[in-house]
Amino acid sequence: MSKSYNNYIGLLDNAGILLKKVKQIPTDTKTVEEPKNPDECNVYQIVKHLINTGEDQILREKYFAGGLSYKYAKEYLYEKLSAFLLPLQERFAEISDDEVRKLLQEHSEKVNAIATRKIEEIYQKI
């Protein structure tokens, strides 16, 4: 996935964009019935970071056993990605621009005060 190709997964991608990007993840040409190696699958390489050990073991077994479609794997990835990103997206939506400006103003005043004291110390030592 590359930002240059606009196929990266953004933290704030809405459901439609996320689904489109997941569907575009390249896979090999093996049929549903054929066993697949999860370590060679782009979809698995992403989803393995979003699931627990038990889920990972079950998914790996499905890959090796055959019968796993890439459509299913991509839907599973989409489901896990959505669940992972939703809390972040909800929190982002809650934060208003005014809150951010207020926090930046408060902290910039604190930082300026500290920096001014440090600069004065340095001038006195020189």
Please give the residue ranges for each predicted region.
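Conserved nucleotide- and phosphate/pyrophosphate-binding catalytic cores
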Residues: 1-126
